[in-house]
Regions:
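The C-terminal output helix
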Residues: 1-8, 152-154
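Non-transmembrane alpha-helical segments in soluble domains
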Residues: 32-36, 114, 141, 145-148
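Catalytic active-site module of serine/aspartate enzymes centered on a nucleophile-bearing elbow/loop
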Residues: 119-161
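Short catalytic/ligand-binding loop motif for oxyanion handling, primarily in non-cytosolic enzymes
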Residues: 44, 105-106, 132
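Conserved loop-alpha-helix segment in the C-terminal half of the alpha/beta-hydrolase fold
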Residues: 85-128
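Short, glycine/charged-enriched secondary-structure capping and boundary segments
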Residues: 1-2, 110-114, 137-140
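Short histidine/acidic/glycine/proline-rich micro-motifs that form metal-
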Residues: 18-22, 104, 130
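Alpha/beta-hydrolase
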Residues: 4, 8-89, 93
Length: 161
């Protein structure tokens, strides 16, 4: 994702990260429009839905940083080496993974993950980000409702396109 950023802005962000100055107000001032508004929820932050605003307002940064690490451009926290992909085959409940074009998570990885569940299905939101339930609602809810209805009818895998 960093490759998509303006080089000057990315350079400033990298410099702040190299100095471990994550509380620098410039850091969040740059991350908000150039990362969060592009890859988390694709609206200006002041127009984010109320649940998103509340989430960010009440985010426990100590726990988030412990798990993710201080940077949004790589995992350096407790999750850095956490991998349970070999256990996904044991989850037999119909499972839907969702990927989106602008997501901070790789949609191809989400698609791959759906193939690891015995009853996995995948939904791609072509106009969405990490919170595609807000910024690609048509695709997200059409796919989610189709998945729920199919599972309710007893289907294990659902083709969503």
């Amino acid at each position: 994702l960093s490759k998509q950023m303006n080089a000057k802005i990315l350079d400033t962000i990298r410099r702040i990260e190299a100095n471990k100055d994550f509380t620098n107000p410039t850091y969040m001032r740059l991350l908000t429009p150039h990362f969060y508004e592009q890859h988390i929820c694709r609206f200006p932050a002041d127009e984010w839905p109320d649940p998103v605003k509340r989430t960010f307002k009440h985010l426990n940064s100590v726990i988030y940083t412990q798990m993710q690490g201080p940077s949004e451009f790589g995992i350096a926290g407790n999750l850095a080496n956490w991998d349970v992909s070999d256990l996904l085959k044991n989850i037999t409940t119909p499972t839907l993974t969702i990927g989106a074009k602008y997501d901070s998570m790789d949609p191809e990885f989400m698609k791959w993950m759906s193939t690891q569940f015995p009853n996995g299905s995948y939904l791609y939101c072509a106009n969405g980000s990490h919170m595609c339930m807000y910024d690609d609602q048509q695709t997200y809810f059409k796919g989610l409702i189709k998945f729920i209805r199919a599972v309710d009818k007893g289907e294990k895998k659902v083709v969503l396109d």
